Amino acid sequence: KMDDKNILEKVSDNIRLARLQKRISQEKLAEMVDISTKYLNMIENRKANPTIVIVVKICKVLNIELSAIWSE
């Protein structure tokens, strides 16, 4: 079942994984997406629920498909 918590966990984990695979620091990604490092850290640690606009920007910067963020 796809409840809010489950979706947020998937998105958070996949953003962190994609960022690490691209060898980009939180500081650099946050700067490129125009959000604070603290906010990106909160997203990656499942403590913030990012808007779709932020998620799309992150995907563009990391050069990944939006659908990759929702996948298992």
Feature names for model-found ranges:
Residues N45, I64, S71:
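Short, conserved catalytic or interaction motifs in soluble domains
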Residues T51-A68:
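DNA major-groove recognition helix of helix-turn-helix/homeodomain DNA-binding modules
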Residues K1-K10:
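A detector for short, charged/polar N-terminal pre-domain segments
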Residues I15, L29-A30, L40-I43, I69:
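Conserved hydrophobic/aromatic packing and binding residues within compact polymer-binding modules
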Residues D34-N49:
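Recognition helix of helix-turn-helix/homeodomain-like DNA-binding domains
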Residues D13-K28, M32, K57:
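Short basic helix-loop element that most often maps to the first helix and adjoining turn
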Residues E9, L20-Q21, N49:
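Short amphipathic helical patch at the helix-1/turn junction of helix-turn-helix
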